[in-house]
A protein has these predicted regions:
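Alpha-to-beta junction loops
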Residues: 1-2, 90-92, 173-181
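Hinge/lid segment of periplasmic solute-binding proteins
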Residues: 1-51, 55, 108, 112, ...
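Short, solvent-exposed loop/beta-turn-alpha elements that line the ligand-binding surface or hinge
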Residues: 17-31, 95-96, 100-103, 118-143, ...
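Extracytoplasmic/periplasmic solute-binding protein
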Residues: 36, 40-46, 51, 77-130, ...
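Extracytoplasmic/periplasmic substrate-recognition and gating elements
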Residues: 39, 63, 191-256
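Glycine-centered hinge/linker elements that transmit conformational signals in sensory
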Residues: 80-81, 126-161
């Protein structure tokens, strides 16, 4: 079975076979891709994904810029503001695709974008999870959200009904330059051409962010049921080992499923967005961890999402977002953990 991260593991850890002595665990490229319960290895990630701000190189160049001009939030804002001001001349509807808060799209902002202030708070405090988020970087969250909804293809009041498909259509229709999403979205945007796709880190105005890379992690971890028979456990371990070491298994995962797997025998992906993600790492940029797997509940995400939507529509204040983020976290953590 699978879990999505530490929060999921907390519910299922009693059923997790210890993988620390398995051949599968020995094939991992980094220990950071394993979830532990004390000394036991309870779960192992089997697919690594990356997200950031996908951009259309052709449109960015037409506006007079390249990726080299964008090294932090201030640069991103300057470029986006300029594109927005010249949108008629450039033939676009906005710098950014619509930040849709319909259920097909809101996860990009209440989860993936919200990861950034959490990541920087954890980093500053030297922690990996918390029962009470402080909201140290919520002013930074505000400025990137303000940029997304201001330099956009649509009026912020319309975001509640804007969908994931709307954003894809705007981006592939060359009506927007920037689109926050991840490596998994390649199939949706491939019509623009591989050479025309670039990816930027999500800058939120934090000191030293010129060294920041893309957001890389996993929400997909294999667990083996310790209540199964020994024969079934061994058969499962043998199969998973075959998946990540054999030519047929690694080909199926890379080519048929489009996965980047965190194992030594992994095949290279043909997805150009994954190539870009790998280049950031090769260039020594610091990847942003996926800390959203420590968010206390789905209810917490929904509270943040509702507050973001109301703020964008002008019916709510930013303070409501802060309350949903900070007070909501403490409340939901307590409900989940007692």
């Amino acid at each position: 079975f699978q879990v999505n991260g530490p929060v999921g593991l907390a519910n299922w850890k009693d059923y997790c076979y210890d993988l620390s002595g398995s051949q599968l665990y020995g094939e991992l490229t980094s220990d950071s891709f394993a979830l532990k319960d004390g000394d036991a290895v309870a779960a192992i990630a089997y697919v690594i994904e990356t997200y950031g701000i996908i951009y259309n190189k052709e449109l960015l160049t037409a506006a007079g810029y390249t990726q080299d001009d964008i090294k932090g939030f201030d640069d991103l804002k300057k470029v986006a503001d300029d594109i927005q001001a010249r949108k008629a001349e450039l033939g676009v509807d906005g710098a950014f695709t619509s930040a849709g808060m319909d259920g097909s799209s809101d996860w990009r902002f209440k989860t993936h974008l919200a990861n950034l202030p959490i990541y920087y708070e954890y980093k500053a405090d030297g922690i990996g999870s918390t029962d009470a988020i402080k909201g140290t970087y919520l002013d930074n969250y505000k400025q990137i959200w303000d940029l997304y909804i201001t330099d956009s293809t649509c009026d912020p009041k319309l975001l509640a009904s804007k969908t994931g498909n709307d954003a894809v259509a705007e981006f592939t229709g060359k009506k927007a330059v920037f689109y926050q999403n991840g490596t998994w979205a390649y199939g949706d945007v491939s019509s623009l051409g591989d050479d025309n796709l670039g990816m930027l880190p999500i800058y939120i105005g934090v000191e030293g962010e010129e060294n920041q890379g893309l957001c890389t992690g996993s929400e997909n971890f294999w667990c083996v049921n310790n209540a199964a028979s020994e024969a079934d456990i061994q058969a499962t371990l043998d199969f998973l080992y075959w998946c990540v070491t054999s030519d047929k298994g690694t080909s199926a995962m890379a080519d048929d499923m489009g996965f980047v797997i965190p194992f030594k025998a992994a095949k290279d992906s043909t997805n150009p967005l994954i190539g870009i993600a790998n280049q950031y790492v090769a260039d020594g940029k610091t990847s942003v961890d996926w800390c959203f797997s420590t968010m206390p509940s789905e209810e917490w995400k929904n509270g943040v999402g509702s507050a973001l939507t109301a703020y964008a529509a002008g019916t709510g204040k930013w303070d409501d977002v802060v309350t949903a983020f900070v007070d909501g976290w403490a409340k939901e953590y307590k409900l989940a953990n007692g």
